[in-house]
Design a protein with these regions (language model features):
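Short capping loops/turns at secondary-structure boundaries
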Residues: 156, 160-163, 189
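Active-site beta-loop-alpha junctions enriched in small/polar residues
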Residues: 45-47, 77-81, 108-111, 149-151, ...
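Hydrophobic residues in well-ordered beta-strands that form the structural core
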Residues: 42, 103-105, 145, 183, ...
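Loop/helix-junction capping segments adjacent to catalytic residues or to phosphate/diphosphate-binding pockets
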Residues: 83-86, 153, 190-193
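Acidic/histidine-rich catalytic cores of soluble enzymes
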Residues: 73-74, 168-222
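Active-site groove signature of glycoside hydrolases
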Residues: 136-156, 177-186
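Flexible glycine/acidic-rich beta-alpha junction loops that bind and position SAM and/or redox cofactors
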Residues: 50, 154, 219
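N-terminal pre-domain/capping segments
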Residues: 2-141, 158-161, 168, 175, ...
Length: 222
């Protein structure tokens, strides 16, 4: 992929049981740090076509970021991990160290909606993301990105309650590891900036934030 095409496509701004909470106590655990504000990182989704075509694997990501693009940080997509066993993660961590790469965050898809309209859905959302909190901490990432859409035409006030419940449960789990939980505007209520501000105020947690997608915001996202 040419560098120009890569930059245009990325706009880079800087199952259960595979890995459990025991990793939080592992002697190889990375210290969770936020990246420098003036640095940039590569979002793995920008290279998804090459990955799906089999040109390289997740374990190669640190090398690709350093040798092809000369950047210092990488942002993972959870669905592009092969099988995240502890041995696999150790190799990935070593690859990043060998190439001087900071692993910034993990973008999580297919793990539930942060605006589920049932208590069961809210609880399951939090449970599903726990393993990615553990993996993020092990790798030294500082955040996990989530999706928060809600049912179509959901009442915005009710949606605030649903999401606050879901994210408070997840944040309770991520707090000991100091892993931030962030929302990307990927449709539904997350495309409403006023609603997002209200959710941030309602949850009121320093580990809770946003991860704006500036490429294709909805008409109401300003």
């Amino acid at each position: 992929m040419k560098r120009r095409k890569f930059i245009e496509s990325s706009i880079v701004l800087g199952a259960a049981g595979l890995v459990g909470p025991s990793l939080l106590k592992n002697e190889l655990m990375s210290e969770t740090k936020s990246p420098p504000r003036d640095d940039i990182s590569v979002a793995q989704w920008a290279l998804v076509e090459e990955i799906r075509a089999g040109k390289w694997k997740n374990l190669d990501f640190p090398k690709i970021a350093r040798e092809d693009f000369g950047v210092n940080g990488i942002e993972f997509v959870n669905t592009l991990f092969e099988v995240p066993t502890e041995d696999y993660l150790r190799k990935l961590k070593q690859n990043a160290k060998d190439h001087g790469i900071t692993m910034v965050l993990i973008m999580c898809d297919a793990e539930g909606d942060g605006c589920a309209d049932t208590r069961e859905g809210q609880k399951q959302f939090a449970i599903n993301h726990r393993k990615w909190v553990d993996i993020a901490h092990y790798l030294g990432c500082h955040a996990v990105r989530t999706n928060c859409r809600g049912p179509q035409n959901a009442d915005k006030k009710e949606a605030l309650k649903w999401s606050a419940d879901a994210y408070n449960q997840l944040l309770e789990y991520s707090k000991p590891a100091s892993i931030s939980i962030v929302i990307e505007n990927h449709g539904g209520v997350s495309n409403d900036p006023d609603w997002m501000v209200e959710l941030m105020k309602k949850v009121n947690n320093p580990l809770f934030g946003t991860y704006p997608d500036w490429r294709s915001p909805s008409k109401e996202f300003d």
